[in-house]
Amino acid sequence: MAQKDITTVLSMTYKPGEKLMVDFAGDKLPYIDPETGETAKAEVFIGCMPYSDYIFACCVPSQRTEDFLFALRLCLEHLGGVPPIVVPDNLKAAVITPDKHEPGLNKALQDMGNHYGFTVLPCDPGEPTQKALVEDAVRITYNRIAAKLRGRDIVGLLALNKAVEEQNVMLNQTRMQKRPYTREERFHAMEKPQLKPLPEQVFEMRYYADL
């Protein structure tokens, strides 16, 4: 599905500020571990506000629950508010047992939802259109960022995230094809005013024996 087709479908399907779609990219980004000097690889978390196609990306060490929730927290802080619905693509850190009617959610993610005031609605495994839209948006974002960083020797995860942030800003501020606005302009005009305020207290993850 072409980028312009994805954007058109997303903006037609979703209400402003209603949903945040989140997933990890299928591929990782390399960086140099400052302690060992060896090449390490980071997981790339990507969040997308589908109405505006506004993107947030950051890197974390793994797809473990604590890293996923940390990335999600950074995403919400970047957005400056909370959408009522968060849609994970059946990540293991988010969804324990995928099911169309009653998916088994990770307890820590449920705790986070209660803290921030959002509902978790995983992608319907039987709805290929929604799943394809999320995966395509993630793939396109990753490819654009990875292409810009290719060949650079980036030392440390903090430096990698700084480089990713720079490319993320450029992506959101680039005029979209056949549209008179950028992702950033549309997000701030149409979506951010609809978001609920962030809670005063930062979410702290509770650990469960069965996580």
Regions found by a protein language model. Name each.
Residues 1-55, 66-67, 204-211:
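Mobile-element integrase/transposase regions
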Residues 57-82:
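Active-site beta-loop-alpha junctions of metal-dependent nucleic acid enzymes
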Residues 71, 108, 112, 133-141, ...:
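Alpha-helical scaffold elements adjacent to nucleotide-binding pockets in ATP/GTP-utilizing enzyme cores
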Residues 81-101:
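Acidic/histidine-rich, metal-coordinating catalytic segments
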Residues 88, 99-100, 120-143, 160:
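RNase H-like two-metal-ion nuclease catalytic core shared by retroviral integrases
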Residues 102-120:
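Two-metal-ion acidic nuclease core segments, chiefly of the RNase H-like superfamily
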Residues 138-211:
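Active-site-proximal acidic segments at structured loop/helix or strand boundaries
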